[in-house]
Amino acid sequence: MKLVVLVALWLWPSSLLAYPTITVLPDEEQNLNHYVHILQNLIMSVPTKEQDLGKKLSSSRTVDSAEPRSLASKVLLTPGLVSAQDVTPESDVLIRPVDETTNSRTRGFTLRRRRTQSTAFWSIRPNNISVVLRTEEPFIEKEPEPELESSRLPTEPEPELEPEPEPVAESRQMSEPEEELVTSTTPNKELTGTSRISSMATQPANTQATRITVTVKTTSTMDVSTDSEDVPQLSGQSEIPSAEDLPGRHSLNTRHEDILKKISNINAEIQQGLLGGNNSPEFKEFIKASREHLKRSLALAAAAEHKLEQMYGSNVFPEGRTSDPDNDMEMIINMLYNSRSKLSDYFNIKRVPSELREKASVVNAELRKILCVDQVEMQSLIKKLLSNNMKILNILNVP
């Protein structure tokens, strides 16, 4: 007790200069001392003694995983089974299985990390008021990914449209001669010895995986169950469905192929029909008749065009051109004479088309002026006829 008092008095000035006076309640101080005592016991009970390496088997593996905490979460630590004398400044850790009666399988092995210089993850202030913990993980060492293994990973090609997609296992790379890990799907297969596990977790192309190297050494029997539910990254089949397995993409792919197939069938039928039709007599007769009809049509078109040229070149339409008046009179008289039987129809306004009625009315008016007298002259003529008739009647009625 005296020694504790002397040490406290000796440390009191330095702590007073480093930290100001803090008022602490008795309950808080008791709780803090209790926590510090628990942490000290936990730190003293961490075993770091290196085990004998002569009886262990060596086989190297590297573990690549996007979730490095999953391995540590499945290991049971037993800090109370090793005495404080086994603690060494090295970073080696001994992990032993817990003796419990459970239905699940237990696994025990020694996890050894490479010797690297690192700071402690805890510290205690001089006045024992607070404890500072660091968040460094002492069991995981990150290393850059080597170029040799990165070259082995083929780039994932884009999914192609195929009618019947077949899932391709991406774990074919694990069957190379460099792999020495033996896995089995049976639940109770025992593996003994020291192994360094190496596998590359399947991830999508747009995510960047963190490469983590963990050295694992086993000192006892270990049961490994590689069921697809427990360890999906080692099962050889990715849980992410590919683009070829989607039902919509498959149906669209089959629809496109059906359309292309129908088009090719129609093209083949057309080619066969053309080749077979050239030899049939009906087809030849049809072609011959079509050619003759085309020739007749071209001849009629040429004749009509020639006739129009003659009409425009003749004096039928003398409008805008100077011509001989005697020839024009002869042409018009001949035309009226040739069409004298249809003049009544031509000059009937009711039968004339609407676009020609105005011109027909002008022609009728001019003909009436020429062929008929005016109304005044007509009335005088009628009066003369009436007077003549009266004279004739008077002469006949003479007694």
Swiss-Prot record:
Residues 1-18 form the signal peptide. The keyword Signal applies. Residues 182-206 have a biased composition (Polar residues). GO terms for cellular component: acrosomal vesicle. Disruption phenotype: Knockout female mice are fertile, while the average number of pups that are fathered by knockout males is significantly lower than that of wild-type fathers. Involved in fertilization ability of sperm. Belongs to the SPESP1 family. This is Sperm equatorial segment protein 1. It comes from Mus musculus.
